Amino acid sequence: MPGGRRGPSRQQLSRSALPSLQTLVGGTCGNGTGLRNRNGSAIGLSAPPITALITPEPVRHCRIPELPVDGGLLFEFLFFIYLLVALFIQYINIYKSVWWYPYNHPASCTSLNFHLIDYHLAAFITVMLARRLVWALISEASQVGTSSVVHYTTLIIGRLVLLTLCGWIFCWTLVNLFRNHSLLNLLFLGYPFGVYVPLCCFHQDNRSQPLPTDCGYLVPDSLVDEGANGAGSLVRPKDFLSLLRESLREQLNSAPSVPSHSCPLSPDLIRNEVECLKSDFNRRIKEVLFNSLFSAYYVAFLPLCFVKSTQYYDMRWSCEHLIMVWINAFVMLSTQLLPPKYCDLLHRSASHLGKWQKLEHGAYSNAPQHIWSENTVWPQGVLVRHSRSLYKAVGPYNVAVPSEVSHARFYFLFHRPLRLLNLLLVIEGSLVLYQLYSLLRAEKWNHTLSIALILFCNYYVLFKLLRDRIVLGRAYSYPFSSYGLKPH
């Protein structure tokens, strides 16, 4: 073979021409690894970066207008009126009479069989439905500043009178129900509380990770101290009374104020903010689900449990009314607890978080691959390896953990700002269309009356959703250059 000095091979030339990780992502990799070859072995690059070839695209946020939202007391009053209307409709469906017949029977003199209605049960249901309104009244009155001793004394007396009246009616109805009904029927009175305690009170989030101190607006200070002092250790299980007190405090407290978004630059701060918002969103969804099911249970299901065996009613129509009440209560509570400003906050946080797409083994074998680092902001299209898997950056700004399913779920739900609003609009619009169709085909007087009354309530909710969708759709479609915004 001819001698002489050999030149660099094609593989060596290709390796030396590739930029380092600092050049690609505009930062340093915490583990000191560089690119990978086809066999998957790491290649250390000692050459300094030439120029910044790929930089993360800056995150820009749209400015949305301030949309009117019902106050806490006004919403609770409207929600209580809606539940009373739905309860009245269910009693019509159960105890309707043939009032157009000749007056040969006392029951035919009126449109309802009033002698079959249990008024103690109706009073008990009304008290249970009014619990949120009563607490909203007390909370609003407590927030008003007391300028004099007389005003403060009047406030205390008014609260005591209101709570005493509700407690007396509640106990009076319970005593009469215990006298007139069997134990099996009485078990249905507290069934929602029996389900809520094991499902919600005993549910403990995984707090092995330290909670960030900059999210104090979302979690109590005690939990922040526990997360800061007990990093790496699990929280001790709490007793039943402590869990019950915390759960009741969450139910009785008014809805928390919408937190603010600070556009953090550190990947750790972004992930901590996402964890706080995720916990807050789960708590709000839990409150929406419980209160909507609670309302539908006491409005439409509990009256069916106390119907006498000799009483005939349309089971299919009553169950249909139950489903309609639950869906509309769910949408009403969602629009109040998940306002547009809060959804925009979740969208901004998801834009900073980003997402990773898992690739199959052997894909992109010729492309540069890096070891994922938690201190690096990854641009779109970069390939990283994490937990023996290959991932591709999807978002323009990526700090999420590739193997964390909750991060991918958070980005999927909130990276489009109108996704939740569109979902609620589709649900409410479908419900209204179905009710209009049922109204056209209704032949019985109680069906026509019940659908007409419910439609008046649903029109208000649908109007608010359509208004928010039109305004926010134009706001998010407006070009960024027109705002004069600076990228974060």
Curated annotation (Swiss-Prot):
Q: What is the lineage of its organism?
A: Eukaryota, Metazoa, Chordata, Craniata, Vertebrata
Subcellular compartments: Membrane
User: What family does this chain come from, according to its entry?
Assistant: Belongs to the TMEM39 family.
Gene for this protein?
A: tmem39a-a
Parts of the chain that traverse the membrane: 72-92, 110-130, 155-175, 182-202, 287-307, 319-339, 420-440, 446-466
Q: Carbohydrate attachment sites?
A: 31, 39, 180, 206
One Pfam family hit? Tmp39
One Gene Ontology term of the biological-process aspect is:
negative regulation of autophagosome maturation
Q: Which protein is depicted? A: Transmembrane protein 39A-A
Record's Gene Ontology CC terms?
A: endoplasmic reticulum membrane
The species this protein belongs to is Xenopus laevis (African clawed frog)
